Amino acid sequence: MTQTPLYGERAIAEAELICFDNPRPGRPYEVSIELPEFTCKCPFSGYPDFAVLRMIYQPGPRVVELKAIKLYVNSYRDQSISHEEVTNRILDDLVAATDPVWMQLEADFNPRGNVHTVVRVSHGTRQPC
């Protein structure tokens, strides 16, 4: 029997990074977004990894829509991917979608096996606000 995907599963599967025009393109400002329920799978053990994602960026021409980023990061839930690769991939996708002046993404993974990992990546040059 084929089961129809639940509405949340469909929304995650269809997720794309939706952006809108920067309402203040001439003004330097920063946007800070925290996503405290990020999950993916360890590519070596298959165990789940949990992290808090913290993004700070200075918008260029586009700003990312909040529900879209939530659904996008939820799409990693069942992917087997390293901490380093997932952090860099998310940053690359966000940069491609928004073309920011500057962006930093920090992935603060929960300790597992007495090891705590924080991966921080950035793009561009931070401007004074």
UniProtKB/Swiss-Prot annotation:
Report the function annotation for this chain: Catalyzes the NADPH-dependent reduction of 7-cyano-7-deazaguanine (preQ0) to 7-aminomethyl-7-deazaguanine (preQ1).
Q: Which reaction does it catalyse?
A: 7-aminomethyl-7-carbaguanine + 2 NADP(+) = 7-cyano-7-deazaguanine + 2 NADPH + 3 H(+)
Q: Name one Pfam family in it.
A: QueF
Show the HAMAP family listed in the entry: QueF_type1
Q: Name one GO biological process term.
A: tRNA modification
Protein name (record): NADPH-dependent 7-cyano-7-deazaguanine reductase
Q: What is its EC number?
A: 1.7.1.13
Source organism superkingdom = Bacteria
Q: Which gene encodes it?
A: queF
Any single GO CC term annotated in Swiss-Prot or TrEMBL for this entry:
cytoplasm
PANTHER family per the record?
Answer: NADPH-DEPENDENT 7-CYANO-7-DEAZAGUANINE REDUCTASE (PTHR34354:SF1)
GO MF terms here are: preQ1 synthase activity
What species is given as this protein's source?
Answer: Synechococcus sp. (strain CC9605)
> Pathway, per Swiss-Prot/TrEMBL?
tRNA modification; tRNA-queuosine biosynthesis
Q: Where is the active site?
A: 42, 49
Sites where the protein binds substrate = 64-66, 83-84
Q: Which Gene3D superfamilies match?
A: 3.30.1130.10
Q: What family does the database annotate? A: Belongs to the GTP cyclohydrolase I family. QueF type 1 subfamily.
